[in-house]
Amino acid sequence: MAFNFNWSPLMADASFYTRAQDLLTAALNKSPKPPIIVDDIIVTELNLGSIPPELEILEIGDLAEDRFRGIFKMSYSGDAFLTLKTRVQANPLNTYLLTRPSFATPLPLAAATPLTIPLQITLSDIKLSGFVILVFSKQKGITVVFRNDPLESLKVSSTFDSIPFVRDFLQKEIEAQLRILFMDELPAIIHRLSLRLWVPEYRAGEDFETQAEKAETANGEGPGQDPLASPPQDPVDALGHALDESDIASLSLDSSVEAHSLFSQKNLLRLAALTDSQRTLSLFTPSIREVVYRAWTSPTDQTDAAGSVTSPVLSRTHSQVGSMSSFQDSASIASMQTRSSTPSHTFSGYGLSLGAGRHSKAHSRKRKKRVVDLRRPKTTDDAPSVSDESAFTESTSAPSVCSAPLPILNEQSDDPVTPPLSPDNDLHLPIIPDRHRMSISRPAPRRDIAAEMMRDMGGPSSTSDPATQATQSEDTSATPRATMRAQIPSIYLNEKQDAGSSTGVPRQLPSAILPFLNDNPMNRVVDQALVERLAGEIARRMRDEKFMATNACGSFWDRHSQEESPPPAYGH
């Protein structure tokens, strides 16, 4: 299939070249330019030449009288040329400093002085080859799309052809810009030109937009507003001296006198005071409209800008670990009372702790452990703190079930009742807190007091038969009571002593337990009166403790004491 391609009308139309130059100039300045180019790129000359491009039809999709769509293979090697004009930065150090952050540059003075040189570039010997998709319509114009990069080579002639480095740099940069131009900008340029040629409505609208732009430019170039037309009432010069009307009349925008110093004396004083107050951190700041103050000028301003009545006063509240109640810091309450001196701060912090102390009395004490553990705990810091009244008889008195368990002998067996046959080498006695408080030098009679009470009350001694001891052990393990806990250390020691004497084999006890073994009969004779008094006191306090524990944990005691017989300690 053959067709005629007329290239001469495009060469003869002068308006086409003018419009094409404007579109090319806008396209070249649209993309980001390299930093070495410091001015706009202007297309000064455009010539398409006399040699048309060669087109080869590869495919025709649509063919009609007013429309056409096809794929062509285009190759061009003609005499078209393009001339550009711009300005470049000849000092490479200035370009380097402009493209780097200020804190990372050495900041030279004279070496970084800019030096701009006009540059004229001519593009010729353009060779193109590629596949083009062409769509033609009289209503929509011509659309040309390149499927690949059509630019093969071109020649760049510039003012710096004598410098090889600059010439190569310009060649590389211009080729990169032209590739972007052919792929992105050239199809849009061709489409707009075709609309201008074949669509009269588009041409009329474009002419109207051009006239509107010229009118706006003409209006913007007029003279500005004269600041001397309405001078202030009390004008002063740069030194602060007052000016009369004759001096003001002699001033003009073109005169050498500084017209910007024509300010009011009052405003100058206020500005000076404002500057001094900010420089010296003075509390005095003059009241100037539309000024944001960094500090309150007077109590009235603070009252006006204070918060509303509903704004609460913030105060710290502390939570107690292990309890459900929270209390308010006294320092916060005092500071809140001192801060609420202004009339606007009428909020009270009393309501912050209304619901905080609802369960404070019920949960103010430490949580009680209601499991009677006959084994020695791992740490000795869990020993309960006792009052001064029961500090003397804490080791032998029956503790409350609600209290934490007292530490007892360290046993290796899992059975909490049956003692080992032989004492271990690492045997430890229970920690007696009142020994550290009261500094009792003779703790041995306490063990004898428990033994005397066992004999007086008719309880089982260390020489009783094993059946009775087994019955007591089962009862203790079935129903743990505090009285049995208090008597267990004495029973263990007596059984160990009797077992050691029956076998006849001497067993050496640890040195830590020797002060608690009273084998000297003289001590018992001397302390017999003291033992009797202590036994009576212990029995009385045990009854009192039982009564107090019944009142504190009545439901717990009623659950056990109503069904079972009382322990031997409470038998008399």
UniProtKB/Swiss-Prot annotation:
Region (Disordered) residue ranges read 210-239, 330-423, 455-482
As for subcellular location, the record says: Mitochondrion outer membrane
Q: Which PROSITE patterns match?
A: SMP
Q: InterPro entries, from UniProt? A: Mdm34, SMP_LBD
Give the Basic residues compositional bias ranges: 358-370
* Protein's membrane topology: Multi-pass membrane protein
Q: Which CDD domains does this chain map to?
A: SMP_Mdm34
Bias (Basic and acidic residues) occurs at 371-381
Molecular function per GO: lipid binding
Regions of compositional bias (Polar residues) in chain numbering:
330-347, 387-400, 460-480
Kindly state which keywords UniProt assigns to this record, in alphabetical order: Lipid transport, Lipid-binding, Membrane, Mitochondrion, Mitochondrion outer membrane, Transmembrane, Transmembrane beta strand, Transport
Offer one example of a GO biological process linked to this entry. mitochondrion-endoplasmic reticulum membrane tethering
Subunit info?
A: Component of the ER-mitochondria encounter structure (ERMES) or MDM complex, composed of mmm1, mdm10, mdm12 and mdm34.
Role description: Component of the ERMES/MDM complex, which serves as a molecular tether to connect the endoplasmic reticulum (ER) and mitochondria. Components of this complex are involved in the control of mitochondrial shape and protein biogenesis, and function in nonvesicular lipid trafficking between the ER and mitochondria. Mdm34 is required for the interaction of the ER-resident membrane protein mmm1 and the outer mitochondrial membrane-resident beta-barrel protein mdm10.
* Entry protein name: Mitochondrial distribution and morphology protein 34
**Whose protein is this, by species?**
Aspergillus clavatus (strain ATCC 1007 / CBS 513.65 / DSM 816 / NCTC 3887 / NRRL 1 / QM 1276 / 107)
